[in-house]
A protein has these predicted regions:
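Surface-exposed beta-loop interaction hotspot
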Residues: 73-76, 81-84, 190-194, 198-248
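Phosphate/pyrophosphate-binding loops at sites that engage ATP/ADP/AMP, CoA/4′-phosphopantetheine
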Residues: 4-15, 132-141
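Short, conserved loop-to-beta-strand elements that form functional interface hotspots
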Residues: 23, 27-73, 157-202
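Short, hydrophobic/amphipathic alpha-helical packing segments
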Residues: 2-3, 118-132
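Cyclic-dinucleotide signaling modules
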Residues: 89-105
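Conserved "HGTGT" condensation-loop signature of ketosynthase/thiolase-family condensing enzymes
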Residues: 8, 40-41, 110-112
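Acidic helix-start/capping segments at beta-turn-to-alpha-helix junctions
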Residues: 19-26, 143-151
Length: 257
């Protein structure tokens, strides 16, 4: 069934990201399935190949769900899609027109899925940072980020998995001014797969605006009462994301989930 779903994606034009949601019994099976997905894409897509992520969370009403991100080229503007690698061989896509550049990255995770959440988060964010520096961008250029966290609400040594992730995210995000607000973001739990990050970053002549929801408090100003951590060595970091992000020149709105 997975190959049938993936084959349907090959027929789409300008596919830039594939995200496969499925059930895994443990992290060993997760790594096996992730390797299968990466090898399948390498065999069946020509460059520029889409970035790929495997999310170890069974869909509610199916065994597999494939999320496909593709581009529609505007008739009045040419764009290029190039497959790029960092110095440490982290793969990503660069999309460019005459007035803007967008980075599509996915599947960013630690090499060892058995490390503590904090260490896994640091390794994943270092890969994000490496891509951004390669493109002469910074964290403030990220407009959309997807965060998939194994057992997101588990408590270890008094600290919640999600809070440990937020603390690391806060440290890396501190290097940027965030003049256009934090990214729109997804933060969901998974059964396995460690810490996994996808992101889109944009720079150039584009108008980027953060979006609020009057019915919700902004996540990045949550109070300590809703943040679960007992670390004495660090201040609790809030979830750094906006409820949405508008990239108006691209007629695009990213909604947080």
């Amino acid at each position: 069934m997975a190959e049938e779903l993936l084959s349907s994606a090959v027929r789409e034009e300008r596919v830039v990201r594939l995200v496969l949601f499925t059930r895994c019994t443990d992290n060993q099976e997760y790594k096996f399935q992730r390797s299968f997905l990466e090898q399948w894409v390498e065999r069946h897509f020509v460059s520029p190949r889409p970035v790929v992520s495997l999310v170890a969370q069974k869909p509610l009403v199916a065994n597999l769900v494939l999320e496909v991100h593709s581009l529609v080229e505007a008739a009045d503007e040419a764009l290029t899609i190039e497959e790029q690698f960092t110095s440490s061989s982290v793969r990503y896509l660069r999309i460019a027109t005459s007035h803007y550049r967008e980075i599509i990255a996915g599947g960013l995770c630690a090499d060892d899925l058995n490390l503590p959440v904090r260490e896994q988060s640091e390794q994943a964010f270092r890969k994000v940072e490496e891509i951004l520096k390669t493109e002469q961008m910074n964290f403030g250029d990220i407009v959309r980020q997807w965060n998939y966290l194994e057992r997101i609400t588990d408590i270890t040594h008094g600290n919640q998995c999600y809070q440990d992730f937020n603390d690391v995210r806060t440290l890396f995000y501190a290097s940027s001014a965030w003049e256009s607000g934090y990214p729109a973001a997804t933060g969901i739990g998974t059964q396995y797969g460690g810490i996994l990050i996808d992101f889109n970053a944009v720079s150039g002549e584009v108008d980027i605006v953060p979006l609020d929801n009057d019915w919700q408090r902004a996540a990045h100003v949550y109070s300590d009462e809703v943040l679960i951590s007992h670390r004495a060595d660090t201040e609790k970091g809030t979830p750094k994301f906006e409820r949405g992000k508008s990239v108006s020149d691209l007629s695009l709105i990213h909604i947080s989930e």
